[in-house]
Amino acid sequence: MTGMLPLLAAVVSAAVAGALTVALLVLLPLLMAQPDDRYPETNTFVLRRMDTVMPLLTLLGIGLSAGAVPAAPVVSAAVLHALAVLGLLVLLTVSAIVLRRVNASIAAAPGPAELRVLRHRWRGWHLTRVGGALAAAVANTAAVLLS
């Protein structure tokens, strides 16, 4: 079973990267095109679901990676992946906190300028999250291929 842990960690990492990439391709254009009065509500709807599921999947990936480290012949590759996924978890958590606070402050009194700022902040954070998830998935794939 321990031989399967690196592969399971790779699958979870790919799922995280895939979900964030889908959000980049589908949700980001939707949020950018929302009318001003609908944006805070839609953004809150998306954030509650994405920012609840993604850290849980990322924690699962960390757990699988940690379990795979003793089993991996190339320990450095597994450690690299575990660190990449841990960094992604921190990034997901920080971005969720920042975006929820900004969204809550704007939802109280939304104006076009504030909503533009929120949209661009969300876009920037999301692009960073997608990049981190893809880097973690690549590191995990390398760990599996090298083991």
Please place each PLM-identified region on the residue numbering.
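A cytosolic-side transmembrane-helix exit/cap motif
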Residues: V98-P110
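Hydrophobic/aromatic residues within the transmembrane alpha-helices of Major Facilitator Superfamily
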Residues: G18, T93, A135-V138
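Mid-bilayer segments of alpha-helical transmembrane spans in multi-pass integral membrane proteins
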Residues: L89-R100
